[in-house]
Amino acid sequence: MKVVILCGGKGTRLGFETKIIPKPMAKIDKEPIILHIINYYKKFGYNDFILALGYKGSIIKNYFKKNKNFLINVRCVNTGKNTLTGGRLLKLKKYLSKEKDFMLTYGDGLTNQNLNKLEKFHTKNNKVATMTIVRPPVRFGEVKMRGNLVNNFKEKPQIRDSWINGGFFVFNKNIFKFLSKENEMLEKEPLEKLSKKKQILGFKHLGFWQCMDTPRDKEYLIKLLKTKKAPWKTR
């Protein structure tokens, strides 16, 4: 099964770094986050990747051109600098024409979910789309007090009563019937239509999930890696 990774956004919230490189090339310790994502998919047997490039996409393309020892197949496709996520996927249609199903995720998120179970869940239920849903981590640590004593502290706890889109999708080929133009976000009209037609399922993941939106997020991921507490690490 092919894996699409959306790599075209500008990632402005990450700060000055993304004025020089695209967000998926921002390093978590010694490796860009895009490689952490790919290595995690490899752990579950997925080796065929399509990278939807946009902003500073040539940097990503050159990285994989120079590093051919990853034992994977990587196709880099320029989907436009300002194209939105739905349009990026639409521009990949010809590269996915022979696929009954394919996976898709964002180039800035990490998890420790079982991707094989995600695929089996999608296949069993036979819907157009399966979306991983996660509990959103709060931005600040949670403190529990007993009098003036800090009784418990948890860095980035999960919010317990809501779910959000965590990426790590599985789509079947009928998703392209819901995409019509390049200036639309996958997460808006297409997924809203799928929801109304009862053609999208949520795969609940209660384990680790973290996107890298801000410098604070990046530092948190680096901290996990350096303290050998990175749940996504495969080696």
Regions found by a protein language model. Give the residues of each.
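N-terminal nucleotide-binding beta1-loop-alpha1 segment
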Residues: 1-19
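Conserved N-terminal catalytic core of the sugar/cofactor nucleotidyltransferase
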Residues: 2-5, 27, 31-106, 117, ...
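A generic "binding-loop/recognition-motif" signal
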Residues: 10, 21, 56, 136, ...
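Catalytic-core segments of class I nucleotidyltransferases/pyrophosphorylases
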Residues: 102-103, 110, 116-123, 136-138, ...
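Active-site metal-binding loops of divalent metal-dependent hydrolases
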Residues: 10, 107-109
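A short, conserved acidic/glycine-rich loop-to-beta-strand motif
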Residues: 125-135
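Residue-level signal for inorganic ion chemistry
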Residues: 34, 60, 92, 108, ...
